[in-house]
């Protein structure tokens, strides 16, 4: 905490100075930029393919990130770290982290790499259909108009995956041409382009991005051996969006995008490859003062390959341990209706369906580079739900309340796990009976607003179905083996929060107290040395406070966020050794301070200071990841209306950010200091 407060002071002093300088010469002052949240009623996202915000959006705790220009090493997952309380399973980003570790959650509901927060792109769920991790690199190629972060569970419209909250990505359609190119440390390149314009009675836009780099050595200095080397990456994506007016305030939108992600973990036999193709089609009827509706259908196809290595003591030799391929498919559809009852259509009703299928195909028990055994495991899941939400009152002044409910029926198809010696006998041939059940979720919220002050409160219930990965796939990391558990039950959340907001004359303050009880929480439980199993814990209890403050200072805005999270495991039986411990990968303290310019002068920039506290690497708290304070900053100079040049830096302190630690004490680090320089153009 002392390190964070010191960093706040460092940013605040130049901010105050800039506020003085701006009075004399605001057109030429070099100022810093920040990303600020905006109230739900101000959100306007072009081409998002969704209905206008409802009254219920104003009751939920919401933050919005804007200024999401791609390129120059900008990563969506790192921008999310600007908001305290958003927790990603690993501190490393999509250039070096293993793809299966990139889950996301909120409010201390962690300890598991599967996402407990729902991530959507224009309303389409984005978590991997098999594993629940999020392919963050896929969104760097998309021209995003904003990210809406809704905290807390129980949202009927978002679906059952929104256990801890929803992170909604919203794309926008380019009108003209924009492009950027940058060169960075370790021979890194990052290029992006977007082209869009009118097509008949509609619009068309094409977005693309390519990035690559030689990478850095993941193992911390002083612990490296002969097998350790830099971990290169190569990533790219291409997207096509079409939008046509269908008359009578209706439009049809189609989206097709694909991405490719190649990474390495810094030793031989650890290359991973992820390829994906997504398509969606929607029809939106959104007149003001009349009935509104939306129909959406989508498909997601993923193909993931990864190698895993076994490194000998002393790190002087390495051998293949496992090769894995995971093909998976997600299908879904949604329909929402807002009848014309009165005012701004206070009633929302709808239904949705989601299906996931996938399997893991693995080769292991290597002799040299030849595998001796093959395993295939997988299954399918379906969820069908219906929801309703009613909002009443005045979002701008007085009392506003909302009540939502949802009921879901879920199915787990027959699962399977087959293991055999390659070219020989069958070792395991298991079939797991199909299961099904019903779950309910809901949310009640109220907000009272008077002039600059708002008070709010909410209570909610949500749930999450185990992923196919958690149910059927055992895995190994080094000497650590984790077995699957086909009998896992759905996770269920009860929670509540109270908060206060104040806004006046360029100043915004917000504070939220929350408490959550997650029963049946799925975690990796240690059974014996080097042997774990996924199990339902009795519960994870998490309570804490989230605070944000924002101040306009001349042509700049200063924003700070802080989250205190007190999370503990409630466990018995085989997991009793975890009782009272903090969940793995959850820090008690986290915060950020950002400063960004917000005018149209020729000079601009940003500075973001992030702090993350100590956290446990493992379920028993035997391995601890130290805290870290990092600084990102950048400056831009607009040469004319079309062209600007920029320089950016990541982790300018070159802080050691521990991302993982093995049982033998070997520390994996996140991104070290990285510098970028390049140009942007728009026509």
Predicted features and spans:
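N-terminal periplasmic "start-of-domain" segments of outer-membrane beta-barrel proteins
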Residues: 39-74, 98-103, 117
């Amino acid at each position: 905490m002392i390190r964070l407060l010191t960093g706040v002071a460092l940013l605040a002093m130049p901010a105050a100075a800039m506020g003085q300088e701006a009075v004399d010469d605001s057109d030429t002052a070099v100022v810093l930029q920040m990303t600020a949240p905006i109230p739900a009623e101000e959100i306007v996202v072009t081409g998002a393919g969704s209905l206008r915000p409802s009254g219920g959006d104003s009751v939920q705790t919401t933050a919005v990130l804007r200024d999401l220009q791609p390129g120059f090493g900008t990563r969506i997952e790192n921008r999310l770290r600007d908001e305290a309380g958003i927790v990603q399973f690993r501190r490393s980003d999509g250039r070096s982290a293993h793809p299966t570790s990139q889950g996301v959650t909120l409010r201390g509901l962690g300890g598991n790499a599967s996402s407990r927060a729902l991530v959507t792109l224009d309303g389409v769920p984005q978590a991997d259909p098999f594993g629940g991790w999020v392919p963050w690199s896929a969104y760097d190629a998309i021209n995003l108009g904003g990210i809406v972060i809704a905290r807390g569970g129980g949202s009927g419209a978002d679906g059952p995956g929104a256990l801890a909250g929803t992170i909604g990505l919203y794309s926008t359609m380019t009108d003209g041409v924009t492009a950027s190119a940058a060169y960075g440390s370790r021979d890194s390149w990052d290029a992006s382009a977007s082209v869009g314009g009118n097509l008949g009675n509609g619009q068309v836009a094409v977005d693309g991005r390519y990035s690559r780099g030689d990478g850095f050595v993941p193992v911390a200095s002083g612990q490296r051996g002969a097998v350790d080397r830099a971990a290169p990456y190569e990533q790219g994506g291409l997207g096509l969006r079409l939008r046509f007016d269908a008359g009578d305030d209706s439009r049809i939108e189609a989206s097709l995008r694909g991405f490719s992600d190649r990474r390495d973990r810094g030793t031989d036999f650890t290359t991973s490859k992820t390829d994906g193709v997504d398509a969606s089609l929607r029809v939106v009827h959104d007149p003001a003062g009349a009935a509104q509706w939306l129909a959406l259908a989508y498909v997601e196809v993923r193909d993931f390959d990864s190698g895993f290595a076994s490194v000998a003591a002393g790190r002087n030799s390495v051998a293949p341990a496992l090769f894995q391929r995971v093909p998976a498919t997600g299908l879904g559809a949604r329909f929402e209706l807002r009848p014309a009852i009165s005012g701004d259509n206070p009633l929302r009703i709808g239904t949705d369906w989601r299906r996931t299928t996938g399997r893991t195909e693995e080769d292991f028990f290597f002799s040299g580079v030849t595998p001796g055994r093959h395993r295939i495991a997988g299954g399918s899941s379906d969820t069908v739900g219906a929801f309703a939400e009613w909002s009443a009152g005045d979002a701008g002044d007085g009392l506003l309340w909302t009540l939502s409910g949802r009921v879901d029926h879920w199915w787990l198809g027959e699962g399977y796990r087959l293991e055999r010696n390659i070219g020989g006998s069958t070792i395991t041939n298991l079939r797991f009976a199909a299961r099904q059940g019903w779950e309910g979720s809901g949310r009640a919220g109220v907000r009272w607003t008077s002039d600059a002050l708002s008070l709010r409160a909410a209570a909610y219930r949500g749930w999450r179905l185990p992923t196919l990965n958690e149910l059927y796939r055992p895995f190994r990391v080094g000497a650590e083996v984790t077995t699957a558990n086909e009998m896992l039950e759905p996770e269920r959340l009860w929670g509540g929060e109270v908060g206060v907001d104040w806004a006046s004359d360029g100043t915004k303050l917000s504070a939220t107290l929350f408490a959550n009880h997650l029963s049946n929480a799925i975690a990796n439980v240690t059974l014996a040395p080097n042997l774990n199993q996924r199990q339902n814990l009795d519960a994870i209890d998490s309570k804490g406070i989230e605070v944000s403050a924002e101040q306009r200072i001349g042509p700049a805005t200063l924003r700070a966020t802080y989250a205190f999270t007190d999370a503990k495991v409630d466990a018995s039986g085989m997991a009793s050794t975890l009782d009272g411990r903090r969940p793995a990968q959850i820090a008690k303290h986290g915060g950020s301070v950002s400063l960004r310019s917000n005018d149209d002068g020729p000079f601009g920039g940003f500075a973001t200071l992030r702090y993350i506290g100590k956290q446990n690497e493992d379920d028993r708290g035997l391995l601890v990841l130290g805290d870290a304070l990092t600084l990102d900053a950048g400056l831009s100079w607009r040469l004319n209306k079309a062209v600007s040049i920029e320089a950016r830096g990541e982790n300018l302190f070159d802080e050691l950010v521990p991302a993982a630690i093995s049982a033998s004490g070997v520390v994996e680090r996140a991104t070290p200091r990285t510098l970028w320089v390049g140009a942007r153009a728009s026509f």
